Amino acid sequence: YSAHLFLRDRGKFKQIALGDYQAQFGQGLTFWSGRAFGKGADILMIKRSATGLRPYASVDETLFLRGGGLTYELGKFEITGFYSYKKIDGNVIIQDTSGLAQEEIEAINQEGLSISSLQQTGFHRTPNELEDKDAITQQQMGGHVAYKTRSLNIGATGIFSKIDAKFERSLQPYSQFRNQESEQAKVGLDYNWIYRNFNFFGEVSQSIDAGKAITSGAIVMLDPK
């Protein structure tokens, strides 16, 4: 099921979202819910166009937020805050407690739910897939502050995400650099500047575990027409 209430341009409130919605900021390094298509034959696709908050009206089970958010206009600034709470799928690890003492079993239970990965296929066909359905609670909260003029947009984004399960780290080589923390926090700065026939854009982001990312680009129109 999915439902939402979405309002635009209600006085100083530019966007008000309740229920299922999406949030997109900057170039997506810090936070972007929903799909974003990469570069193709059309070179203009190298730049993402963030919409801020938007209603969710698709069928994918993972690419949305469930809760509420709003965007408030204050002069040349737009301030956005949002919160999401929903159940998501995860590959649950069943601990084998046969032959263990009661104290050991209680210690395992106190550690809470363990998962090997998050499931994003949306399939619930087999007993294992049904067991993984809605196994984890995910909470996300964050905000974005943007300064906007006719030719320049500068924004700052912060996001905190938490799930109520811990990852069992895989020993496979491809998993060694995968973020497997139950709590994540990121901050980022983004910009978009139009000067004559030039459009410069980009974003820099950093996570709480010191991971960094940066993207920057430019679109140049050789003819003003």
Region locations from a protein language model:
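Outer-membrane beta-barrel channel domains
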Residues: 1-225
